[in-house]
Amino acid sequence: VKRAVTDGVLIVTGGPGTGKTTILKFVIEIMEHLGLQIELAAPTGRASKRISDTTGREARTLHRLLEYNFNNNSFNRNADYPVEADVIIIDEMSMVDVMLFHSLLKAVAKGTRLVMVGDVDQLPSVGPGNVLRDLVNSDVIPVIRLNEIFRQAGRSRIVTNAHLINRGEMPVLDNIDEENDFL
C-alpha cells in the first residue's frame, strides 16, 4: 500500500483472491485522505463497473478516460491535453494492448502517478502485445507480487488448481465429480 502512495509508477499483480482489490480500496482511501485527485479506469465496461462496485468510487473505461473521439478515430486526451489527475489507477491491466497503453502514456501528465493492477498470468489482451507481462518482466517498473490466496472462494478447486499450474505443479485431480467438474 505504501509503495502505491509513494512511487511514481507501480504494478500490483497476483492471481484471483490474492487481495488486489482489497489493496486497491486501501490505496484509494489513503490517496483521497491526502487530498489527491484519482482517476480509476479499466479496459472494458464490465471491468470498470466491477471495480466501481467493489471500491464504491466512479470508474470509467480507458476509452472514456482518454475521451475517445469517434469522428477522427483518436483520443482527445494526449500529451497536449493530458488527463487531469494526481493518480491514475488502471485495473485489469492484462487486457490492455500496446496501442491503448501508448495512448494512455501520452495522456499521463508530468507528475501524475500511475498504478497498474492485474493478473500477469491471465490471457493477454485481444489486441497486439502482452503489455502487463512485458512491463513486469522489464525490471524497470517496481512490481508488487501477491501470492497468497485470501478470498474464501480461493479454496475452490478451480482457483487452487490455477495457482498450482502457475507454479508448475500438478493440479489436484482427486474426487472428480463427473457431472460438475470438467477435465
Where are these regions (language model features)?
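Pre-Walker A (Motif I) flank of P-loop NTPase domains
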Residues: 5-12
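Hydrophobic positions on the alpha1 helix immediately C-terminal to the Walker A/P-loop
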Residues: 23, 27
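Short, conserved "post-DEAD/DEAH" coupling segment immediately C-terminal to helicase motif II
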Residues: 98-112, 130-135
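Conserved P-loop NTPase motor core of helicases/translocases
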Residues: 37-42, 46-107, 148-149, 158-159, ...
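Conserved helicase motor core of P-loop NTPases
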Residues: 120-183
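Walker A (P-loop) phosphate-binding loop of P-loop NTPases
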Residues: 17
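Conserved lysine of the Walker
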Residues: 20
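Short glycine-/polar-rich loops that comprise or flank the Walker A/P-loop
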Residues: 35-36, 85, 110-113, 139-144, ...
